[in-house]
């Protein structure tokens, strides 16, 4: 589903309102509290290096070496396939990232960012509650909210 550009701008303004954006960024910061999870910005830029070299070194230092260290520490590894993740996201699950599923069902704290995100994505998807639009950095960011919460739980 392609997002209407006017609606995209409106949605961006809603979620970047100072109070809402602060809650969203705090949630992302909470994902960093577990040393088993690593996040990385792409592309990686370092002084006096080409972007390709910096990206390779970042991968080597942050992912490859850490994976080897964890492989020595743990007996098992869970590997998942999330290739069908975007089309299967339930829009109401954005609320569950910020408040409990039970509170969301009781309609408590309807002003949380998850409710805002879920309802706007649902409108973009012709009021369907399954799936989010593909190909947008904004949707990648929101999908990461759900994946981060899954990692924590």
Feature annotation, model-predicted:
Residues 1-138, 142:
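Conserved two-metal-ion catalytic palm core of "right-hand" nucleic acid polymerases
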């Amino acid at each position: 589903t392609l997002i209407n550009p006017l609606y995209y701008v409106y949605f961006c303004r809603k979620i970047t309102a100072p109070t809402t954006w602060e809650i969203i960024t705090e949630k992302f910061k909470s994902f960093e509290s577990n040393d088993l999870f690593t996040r990385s910005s792409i592309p990686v830029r370092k002084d006096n290096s080409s972007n390709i070299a910096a990206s390779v070194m970042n991968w080597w230092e942050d992912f490859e070496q850490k994976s080897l260290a964890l492989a020595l520490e743990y007996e098992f590894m869970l590997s998942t396939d999330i290739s069908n993740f975007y089309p299967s996201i339930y829009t109401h699950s954005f609320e569950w990232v910020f408040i409990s599923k039970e509170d969301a069902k009781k309609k408590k704290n309807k002003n949380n960012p998850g409710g805002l995100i879920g309802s706007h994505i649902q409108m973009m998807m012709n009021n369907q509650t399954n799936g989010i639009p593909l190909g947008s950095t904004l949707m990648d960011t929101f999908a990461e909210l759900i994946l981060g919460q899954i990692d924590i739980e």
